[in-house]
Amino acid sequence: MSFNGTYVYDFIFCGGSFAAAGAAVRLADEGKRVLLLESARAPGSEYTLAYRGGKIPCDAAASRAAELCGELRGLGAVTSDGRIDHTLLSPALSRILMRRGDRISFFPSSVPLSAEKTLDGWRVCFVTNGVRHTAEAGRLVGADLYDALGGGASGHIKKKYLIGLALCESEKVVAGELPGDASLPGGCRVTVDGDGGDVTVTFSFDAAANMCTARRAVRSYVTGGSFAASGLRLAALADEFAVESDEESVFYGDGYARLAPVRFADAVSAYGDGVLFAERLDGETCGRAPRIRASECKSAGEYDLIVAGLGAAGSIAAITAARLGLRVFAIERGSQPGGVGTSGGIYTYYLGYGGGIYCEADGLAAKLGENGFARERGCGLLTKGMALDAMLDSCGADVVYGASVCGVLHDTDDTERIDGVIFRTGAGFFAARAPLTIDSTADSAVGLLAGCTMLGGRESDGEFQLFSNVSCFLNRENGCAASENCDDGTVDQYDPADLGIKTLASEAAGPHLGKRYADARYRRLGTVPYLGVREGLRIKGIDTMTLERAASCPTDKAIFFELANLDSHAKDFPFESRGYRDVVELCSLWDCRISIPVTKGCLIPAGVHGLIAAGRNISTDHDIALACRMMRAMQKCGEAAGVIAYLAHRDGTDPHNVSDAELRDELIGRNVLDPAQHYAMYFYTADPATRYKKDILELTADEIAAMLALDAPGAAVYACSVNRKLGSDALVRMLDDPASRRGDALALAVRGENAAARDVLIGMIRDKSGEMPCSSHTFCLPYAVSAMSAAGKCGMTEALPALLDIVCDPDYAADIPNLDKVEDKTKLICDGDDVKYLYFVGALG
């Protein structure tokens, strides 16, 4: 395969369905190179995200799927009567594909745009999170649910089912059909299958139904009373329709074939059918293929504002602008709004400031949970998505779910101005026009397609923050739905090959596998539809927020504030910036809560007109991106973007010309912004009365001197780096005091004045006691590691012998005590390998 811009294979499958995977495995075992292009985040979504398990069949299809059946049984995914646990289908399939990683490439989050016949076969253009790519192959197979390139699958769909999981509050056997009501469209039936405890609920819709109307109908039905009267509480709802189709696979004579992905009710049969399909590829054909390229985009209409991406920021932006009177068109690739807070599996808020429209959404979600919905942790996943969609519906925003951004429309008279977007759904390609667009796709899909200049990951190696795989479960004992996440390394979500490799590896292993859910207490709900990506490319804005800029930013320029720590989810500190290392590594201030101002200019891309960013794709450097991504702040960011769009539309001007004063006044009136908020660094103290309330920047000289002699000197050390309230001469004199010696040495080093502290720092490096400060509540580092960081900051060559002793001895830190204690300050140090790693990378840095 070639990775210089064009990927080359023997076969390209547009669709990563179970049928496509079965065919790909058969072809790979014959030595062929195969590419699976899939718009979802993981393979087999037509069954896994549709909550569609079925039973192991007893026919030829099952025999062709023996490897898949073996994986499922090995994972405990098959019951004694042959029923398949749909939540383990994706892990099983991922393991099979990984075994053939040298011959099968899986490209997730990749949307085919066109297919062109060439002399040697086919050339397919596709987009992955806003970046266009090209792949070539001798043979092309359409294998996605709606046949995006061929366009003929929709006519074969006979029925759609939206499947959910409900808690049954009675012990009686629950099965059969529930009574309908006026909230459901004509012909929609509600059936229940189960034996008490938790049951499967199926809502049947006709073939024309879309996810937006279907989920709204389910919400109305559940809250209407009939559902709760049956003793049921809805706990989870599928993210894709389970589809009933009579489509047959077809082979054409020009190197194209159509593989029907959902001919069967179970994934095992579909996989086996794919194997059979591969065996028949060189058989009889029936002429030339139908249309195998994207047709002209159909018009989706003209609006005042387009919101691309209905995540934490986008959903609030759309609601805000629509309530202010704008005609809003919103598109979302998933099945519901809310992003990481719904489809991403993150139930609870992490720090941040309160205030804004999102509080209304949280209140509505809590109210939904009182009638017909199961209890959820935090502000909920299912109920929060339902609440946001209800708000979008009531304010008149036009919403399309299952829509992926594919391109942008440029103003014919101004090529730097965009006036619309192109997107793909199961019904084809569409174009919507508006003078203003909010890019709230998180990964800057619109900004990339529009040609915005981008900011990337950390400066040392370009890597982004770690991503997570989040799995959900239902606690049967307390009737509460919850989730857990597992960090799985770094990923480049714009490189489809890297994204595919990391996704499969993450799916194949993690907290959602093994014996964790084997007992009767928990019911596995599966991994969430969105990969837990924390960072991506960000626009280069008119203003860019950095740690230095935040410290000097006038308070009256801020439109909202983030409140969070610099949480990289990693321990490879030497690869981070010097500013980050000073805070986290040298001062052990991992959980220092920084109040970060965000200005209007951070939301406005430089050089591209008609575009506003909202979410974690706003203009910040990597350090600020570690913090400025939490849900409360991102929802505030969305509300600010919605107000900017309204003011720009009202005044007929570009977003960057909107009055800062009027914008701030509006946001203050909406409780998005509190005039009392300012840049600050709030640190941990042992006293609950002052914990995270004292600001490092406001410490006096006497307070700094006193704290340097305590067991929590970190805040005082950092204070010495940002002000001169305590002079260097005083710090040098304090080196003679054993109680403050370590803190004084670090304080001098953080100023770059290490000469007097050289011997103390080298002694700290050689100290193998493992002693650490209490400067943070959750994650502190040994004084030795902090001293290594200080030596690196100052270029202290005298420390090299001590550092080389650590680097050259792989077991140097094997017997260091005190770090294996179960304490709050060490709980992110997982085991002995972590300790060795911290010392090794500290010495390298």
Predicted feature locations:
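Conserved N-terminal/central alpha/beta ligand/cofactor-binding core
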Residues: 3, 26, 32-33, 38-114, ...
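Beta1/beta-strand and adjacent pyrophosphate-binding region of the FAD-binding site
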Residues: 3-17, 298-311
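N-terminal Rossmann-fold NAD(P) dinucleotide-binding loop
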Residues: 20, 314
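Flavin (FAD/FMN)-binding glycine-rich loop and adjacent Rossmann-like elements that form
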Residues: 46, 131-139, 144-299, 340, ...
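Core register positions within helices of long alpha-helical scaffolds
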Residues: 96, 718-722, 747-750, 790-793, ...
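Conserved beta-strand-loop-beta-strand element in the redox core of flavoprotein oxidoreductases
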Residues: 114-134, 409-431
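Amphipathic alpha-helical scaffolding segments comprising HEAT/armadillo-like alpha-solenoid repeats
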Residues: 695-707, 722-736, 753-774, 796-825, ...
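Conserved hydrophobic register position within alpha-solenoid helical repeats
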Residues: 714-720, 744-747, 784-787, 837-844
